Amino acid sequence: MWVRDRLDGLWCDEDFAGWYPRDGRPGLSPAQLATVCVLQFVLGLSDRQAAEAVRCRIDFKYAMAMELDDPGFHHSVLADFRDRLAEGGRADRLLDLALARLKAAGLVRERTTQRTDSTYVLAAVRDLTRLELVTEAVRAALEEVAGAAGHLLDGLVDEEWGQRYGRPARLGKNPTRPKTRILATGNDAARLLEHLYRHGTGRAWGRQVQALRQILVQNYYRDGAGRLLWRTGEDDGFGLAPSSRAIVSPYDTSARYARHGHIVSWSGFSAHLTETCAPDGPNVITDVATTAATTHDSRVLPGIHARLRRRGLLPAEHLVDSGYTSLVHLEQAARDHQVTVTGPLPGNPTRQHRRGEGFGRDDFHIDFDRREVTCPQGQVSQGWHGPYPTSSPTAAPLIVARFTMGQCRPCPVRAQCTTSRESARNVGFPPRELRDLQLRVRTEQQTPQWKARYAVRSGVEGTVNEFAHGHGMRHCRYRGQDKTHIQHVLTAIAVNIE
């Protein structure tokens, strides 16, 4: 009721004009459908329950500005509206509109303090072993082809195939005759695909057939004699696909397997939540991002800032944990958006620094003007190379200063500098601007003022807990990353208006 009384709704039909064609018969109000979708996540309702609430609950009718005798609509309309939301980033547009209303009401403003954290999200699929994955992919493809063009399976599917693929695969981690099953299932998958492409020329195959093709390639390969073999981690040149590409279920090919440490592992996605945390105002969710489970947190930060800039809600200070901090992104946020990213910067990665003995990188004096490095014993480097780009998009470019064997071999403290007997010491460091930023941030992190400011970040973990356990965000309602993102956006709007 507060949303209707104070904001006159979060959106109006004109906000959705670009989503619909100009001709055709009139449809249901998209503003009302969007409101119902949000109320679903406020109260944890299914589509049927939400449609029933629209029909008979007066508070729903008031929130949607409906007449009391309005009969509502069929529950399947909500699924159709979500399909429309999944197109072209429209879910983010829905959040933009809601935040614009809150900003106009003075509930959220630009250049305050915001904080971000992430959590894991479980896909709406069950965990499968690799053998179960291939078996289930064959079964799903057979079901899809049988429904679309069943005559193509004539002469291929027999009683033995019916016994193998008639029911969902539940083989466990230690099935009987595993090697026989692996080869038989792989050969069945290859035969099925060859049969379909031979007899279904020109036909556009559905998602399950395409998923089977990818799963077959990721789990099998053919040797020089043309035999189909099972991929293992030890195969030279024929190993397993990386987790960022490996499909874990034929029913959701966007879900990925990830592991954090030795405790948390899951198949699904990651959700990144950003909220305001100014002491003189309410906490408002300003951004939600849904990524593959294997996407590193630091790669999400530029996208968060770009969306906040579009909404006119960039923070002055952005509190994040160590997963989001990198020299490149700290410098980029300050340069492009005038945002101070506050979070623990990773320490010096050299072996000497980790062990707390010997000469680490910080013990060398770097002279950028003269392009030389002086070691603790007074020797001056003889080479200055780079900056070189690094393989990681989150790592800073690297300059390498090299010393010679003539300098290092007679050094009395060589053992404290390098363990190599065949080469001299090399020192790597980022360019001057990033190096100055690195030293300044590491110094600030040790001050009580910085620690007091950063302590506010921990509050976002309570918001994550509310999302995950209070609104069921831990488990996907829908399949596919786009639909999962819709769930996260609707949950964010629901949390904002509660």
PLM regions and their residue ranges:
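Basic, low-complexity segments
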Residues: M1-D23
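A short secondary-structure junction motif
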Residues: L10-E14, R57, K61, G470
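Trp/Phe/Arg-rich N-terminal binding region typifying the photolyase-homology
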Residues: A17-P30, L43-L94
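Anion-binding and metal-coordination hotspots
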Residues: Q49, D70-P71, A79-E498
